[in-house]
C-alpha cells in the first residue's frame, strides 16, 4: 500500500506497532487503561486518577472509562468482591480494614457494603483465632499482659474490633494454660 497524503505519509502499520504513542486523547486514554488493566484489576477511580496524572482531557477519559464499564473491563463490584476474598484469606484482614482499603481505592460505599457482607462474624472470628494461633508460639516466654497486648494489637491492626480481639486472645491464652481471670477489660 502506498503512503497517502491523508494519513500523513504513513504506511498501513499502526503507531502501536512502531512504539509511537497515539496522538488522539481517546486513543491515549484507551492505551493507558488497557496497559494498566493488563497487570491487575483496577477500580474506575484508580484509572481516572492515572489518566488525570497523565493529563488526558476529562472528556476523553470519561468516554473511555464509560465504554470500558459498558463492556465489563471495569467492574468495581467484582473488584471489591475479589479484593475482600483475597485480602481476608491471604492476610486475615477483618471487614473494617477491608472496607477502609476499598474506600481508598475509590469503590462506592454500597459496593463495599455488599462485598464485606460476604464475611460473617463467625468466619471473621475463626480467622482471628487462626491468626492468634500462628503468633502464639512466638510470644511464649513473655509475661501474660505483654502477650495479650501484642496479640490483641496484631488483630486490631488487621481491623478486628477490640472486643473480638480480647475475647479471641484470652481464649487462646486460657487454652494454653495461662490464667486470664485477672486481665482487665479496659483494652490494650
UniProtKB/Swiss-Prot annotation:
Cellular component, GO annotation: cytoplasm
Subcellular location: Cytoplasm
GO BP field: regulation of DNA repair
Gene3D superfamilies: Winged helix-like DNA-binding domain superfamily/Winged helix DNA-binding domain
Biased composition (Basic and acidic residues): 15-27
Region called Disordered, residue ranges: 1-28
Similarity comment: Belongs to the RecX family.
Known function: Modulates RecA activity.
Protein name per the record: Regulatory protein RecX
Amino acid at each position: 500500500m502506498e503512503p497517502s497524503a491523508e494519513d500523513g505519509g504513513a504506511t498501513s502499520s499502526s503507531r502501536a506497532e512502531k512504539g509511537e504513542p497515539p496522538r488522539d486523547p481517546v486513543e491515549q486514554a484507551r492505551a493507558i487503561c488497557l496497559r494498566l488493566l493488563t497487570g491487575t484489576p483496577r477500580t474506575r477511580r484508580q484509572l481516572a486518577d492515572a489518566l488525570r496524572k497523565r493529563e488526558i482531557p476529562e472528556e476523553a477519559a470519561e468516554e473511555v472509562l464509560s465504554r470500558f464499564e459498558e463492556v465489563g473491563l471495569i467492574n468495581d463490584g467484582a473488584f471489591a468482591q475479589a479484593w475482600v476474598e483475597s485480602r481476608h484469606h491471604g492476610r486475615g484482614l477483618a471487614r473494617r480494614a477491608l472496607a477502609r482499603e476499598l474506600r481508598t481505592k475509590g469503590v462506592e460505599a454500597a459496593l463495599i457494603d455488599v462485598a464485606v457482607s460476604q464475611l460473617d462474624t463467625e468466619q471473621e472470628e475463626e480467622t482471628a483465632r487462626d491468626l492468634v494461633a500462628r503468633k502464639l508460639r512466638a510470644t511464649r516466654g513473655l509475661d501474660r499482659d505483654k502477650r495479650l497486648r501484642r496479640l490483641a494489637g496484631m488483630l486490631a491492626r488487621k481491623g478486628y474490633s477490640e472486643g473480638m480481639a480480647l475475647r479471641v486472645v484470652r481464649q487462646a491464652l486460657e487454652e494454653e494454660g495461662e490464667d486470664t481471670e485477672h486481665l482487665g477489660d479496659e483494652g490494650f
